[in-house]
């Protein structure tokens, strides 16, 4: 995969944008496959992600609201399931998504139901396996996603993967 971004000209070496830019360097792609930006409402999370998205030096990228991405993903999975020969539907969805975008930026990531959580775990594994970088904003830290949801224990592997693969 070609280098994801050019070095942003920043005065402070340790600033957030500097770290965001540095994660995209080729030598770090193997280790960090994304960034998860969380904080309170109106703190500038979306603005930081938009700055990164605007300055990243790749063409096959997508920025969307997380809710819209999940709606598109459920539609895609529904279409894939029509083909009985495909066994691992979320992985196949990840393959199709990765053919269109090597960088996915999600605004306002949240988990509202167990169906989304179960799909995301397998989908994100497939995306990361194919070299897709994920940048997401959220009002909650990963550990608080789907905090009081039904069968939350099934979401914990996804949260662990999110923490392992993303700079939080």
Q: What residues fall within each predicted segment?
A:
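Hydrophobic anchor at the beta1->P-loop junction of P-loop NTPases
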Residues: 37
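Phosphate-binding P-loop
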Residues: 7-17, 23-32
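Walker A (P-loop) phosphate-binding loop of P-loop NTPases
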Residues: 42
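Conserved lysine of the Walker
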Residues: 45
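Structural recognition of the conserved hydrophobic beta-strand(s) that form the central parallel beta-sheet
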Residues: 64, 104-106, 133-138
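AAA+/P-loop NTPase substrate/partner-engagement loops
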Residues: 54-84, 92
